From Swiss-Prot:
Reactions that this protein is recorded to catalyse: (5R)-5-O-[alpha-D-glucosyl-(1->2)-beta-D-galactosyl]-5-hydroxy-L-lysyl-[collagen] + H2O = (5R)-5-O-(beta-D-galactosyl)-5-hydroxy-L-lysyl-[collagen] + D-glucose
Superkingdom, natural source: Eukaryota
Gene Ontology CC: one annotated term: cytosol
EC number(s) stated in the UniProt entry for this protein: 3.2.1.107
Protein name (Swiss-Prot/TrEMBL): Protein-glucosylgalactosylhydroxylysine glucosidase
GO terms, biological process: carbohydrate metabolic process
Taxonomy of the source species: Eukaryota, Metazoa, Chordata, Craniata, Vertebrata
Keyword annotations from UniProtKB, A to Z: Glycosidase, Hydrolase
Length: 655
């Protein structure tokens, strides 16, 4: 359950909550067993087919009743018979947890009820979450009476932080059962979600399945938001293994890392601005904890936790990461910047406290850098780069570049809000050291890095994307070649997608596709679940890897780049992909559907009820401009260009 952790400091982990629906269906007869995960409807089913009957067990977490879990059983005769049919439900559920001291409460409307509080809080004197469970008791047997053709049973679990909320969700479930709308309402919500976004390729079926799987697992990890629902709900962020993983000493304890902001967020933000804002709101809610982290380091401003739970105070079990993996600050600000460029939603930065986040991080960098009089540059010493094979290095090129980017956005935001920024922000951004080897024309990972030394994962290549750090194609190529050759083949799953994206930037689609194929080693069949490492080890249901893979296609094949005052594109498809369809791209209040082939690009703008949208145009590198009208489409020969707001001068801001 989101936001429920047990343990203090480095022992903090996701609280283990027992599931009353943990039951296996047994028929007592030999039959054909079928298991299916329908990613379009969000339903998992187990079907047993015998010569006499069919038994179907269906499980789902309700999409818009987000605190409800549901199990349905259907028994259906195949042959007419006067004999009853009985199946067993073998339950492994025990109403107890090593993290939560559960106790019984009075039954509620036929449902069992337990509640309990976690054993300890993540910080001294902090809140210990309370959890309530109300559920329909699962009987050990179910019987289809003689002479009855079929029958069904529904079992509910409502889980919430208060008695009132648990009862309310349970009531909602009962009401939906009575109207026959329990599963249909869940499936409608998933249908609406898929209508909001999809990525589909023609010509590469395994790639298509992987993309659908990545979208499904990512969307299933983010909260339900619609036009009527506010983003001001309890959302505890997304951890690398999602909600179902993260107990003690497992899958990063369920903590939130840069994985959320750098790897999962960009694709979500391009499709669902409301979900993107929920991610940013999580960081706003941990602002006070980030302040504590900075103070404990002897710095000013905000230091976001390398491993975050509810309070934002760092709960990483090893202090060295908390103290040195500073790039998390820049990663968070990059997410805020991307959101603003996609939406121009200044309210988040005004009344929504987003400006406090951006400016607090800028103040941190000011207090953390040191001035080197010899080279007349600012240095950031003693850090861990994204490549965690190295500790206590100086001037990690990614760390310094993302710090520069966050300082520049702090200055930009000040102008937008009519505030005067401290001069130090721009001064440090202008003079921070970005390691570069002028002889070999590449970016060393940090001061003293020796070419040929092994690296863990994508690091320097992130300068090109997502940072868009200015460099020539020659230098971009050198960085890709230098680090591709020395990257650990068993490193984390998101790595090769970033190399593929880099080669697509340089127009080498086939080289990119070979690297993208490496990602399939992390995809575990039959349900497209990702492992952290190519050998199947590491974090299970590795959302970080899925996010990196999605970005490789979504931003690689299309060339989408979220820039100031424009959404740039430069489409390029590999030979085994004849067409790419990307539906639901959100930009400045509009939703666009894109179809890309080797010859042509088609952009359709959906009609909208909103009056607070901008008029958009396509500006092509050839010099042509095309007006984007809601409800209509435009087509043009495949080439680079950008989408921007139509202004009286018919021009766009420079980048």
């Amino acid at each position: 359950m989101g936001g429920v952790y047990n343990g203090d400091g480095g022992t903090c982990h996701r609280g283990n909550i027992p599931c009353p629906l943990a039951a296996q269906m047994k028929t007592g007869e030999v039959g054909r067993q079928l298991y299916e995960l329908n990613m379009h409807t969000g339903v998992f089913s187990h079907t047993v087919v015998t010569s006499d009957f069919e038994a179907i067990q269906v499980l789902y977490a309700h999409r818009n009743q987000s605190n409800l879990l549901v199990m349905e059983i259907l028994l259906k005769r195949i042959k007419t018979s006067a004999e009853p049919i009985t199946i067993q439900l073998e339950s492994s559920f025990k109403p107890q947890s090593e993290d939560i001291a559960f106790q019984n409460a009075p039954d509620y409307k036929g449902g069992r009820h337990i509640f309990g509080q976690t054993a300890s809080s993540e910080v001294p004197g902090g809140v210990r979450p309370v959890v309530h469970l109300i559920w329909t008791p699962v009987t050990p047997t179910l019987t289809l009476p003689a002479n009855q053709s079929q029958s069904s049973w529904t079992f509910l679990v409502a889980v919430a932080r208060s008695n009132e909320s648990a009862q309310s969700f349970y009531d909602s479930g009962l009401a939906l059962i009575n109207t026959g709308d329990l599963r249909p309402s869940h499936q409608r919500s998933w249908a609406e979600l898929w209508k909001g976004s999809s990525i589909e390729v023609i010509g590469a079926e395994s790639l298509n399945r992987a993309l659908i799987g990545c979208m499904f697992y990512l969307l299933g990890s983010f909260p339900y938001v619609n036009k009527e629902a506010s983003a001001a709900f309890e959302f505890g962020g997304v951890s690398p293994g999602g909600l179902s993983n993260g107990s003690e000493d497992e899958d990063y304890h369920g903590h939130v890392f840069w994985d959320q902001d750098t790897w999962m967020y960009p694709s979500i933000a391009l499709f669902y601005p409301a979900l993107a804002r929920a991610v940013l709101q999580y960081r706003v809610e941990t602002l006070e904890g980030a302040q504590v982290n900075a103070q404990q380091m002897g710095c000013k401003g905000l230091k976001f936790a390398w491993e975050s739970a509810v309070t934002g105070v760092d709960v990483c079990p090893e202090d060295v990461y908390s103290q040195q993996e500073l790039h998390i600050n820049g990663d968070v600000i990059l997410a805020f910047q991307q959101y603003y460029y996609l939406t121009q939603d200044l309210e988040l930065f005004q009344s929504g406290r987003g400006s406090e986040v951006v400016w607090g991080v800028a103040d941190f960098w000011v207090s953390r850098v040191t001035w080197d009089s010899a080279d007349q540059q600012y240095h950031i010493k003693g850090v861990i780069p994204p490549d965690e094979y190295y500790f206590t290095v100086d001037n990690s090129v990614f760390t310094n570049a993302v710090a520069q980017r966050s300082l520049e956005f702090a200055v930009e935001l000040s102008a937008l809000l009519a505030e005067v920024p401290p001069p130090a922000w721009q001064d440090i951004a202008d003079k921070i050291k970005i390691p570069f080897d002028p002889e070999l024309k590449f970016h060393p990972e940090f001061d003293g890095y020796k070419p040929g030394n092994k690296v863990k994962q994508a690091d320097v290549v992130l300068l090109g994307f997502p940072l868009a750090f200015p460099m020539s194609p020659e230098i971009r190529r050198n960085d890709l070649e230098m680090y591709e050759a020395v990257t650990d083949p068993l490193g984390p799953a998101m790595t090769w997608g970033m190399f593929a994206l880099g080669w697509l930037e340089l127009g080498e689609a086939e080289k990119a596709q070979k690297l993208l194929q490496k990602c399939f080693k992390n995809v575990q069949k039959p349900f497209q679940v990702w492992s952290e490492s190519a050998d199947g080890s590491g974090c299970v249901n590795f959302l970080t890897g899925m996010g990196g893979f999605l970005q490789a296609v979504l931003f690689g094949y299309t060339g989408f780049r979220v820039q100031k005052e424009q959404l740039a594109f430069s489409p390029l498809l590999p030979l085994d992909v004849s067409a790419l369809s990307v539906k639901g791209v959100c930009y400045l209040g509009h939703k666009m559907d894109w179809t890309i082939t080797s010859e042509e690009v088609k952009v359709s703008v959906r009609k909208t009820d909103s009056k607070e949208t901008f008029t958009l145009q396509v500006v092509l590198n050839s010099g042509s401009t095309l007006l984007l009208t809601p409800g209509q489409s435009v087509s043009f020969p495949r080439q680079p260009g950008h989408i921007c707001q139509l202004k009286s001068s018919s021009s766009c801001w420079p980048i």
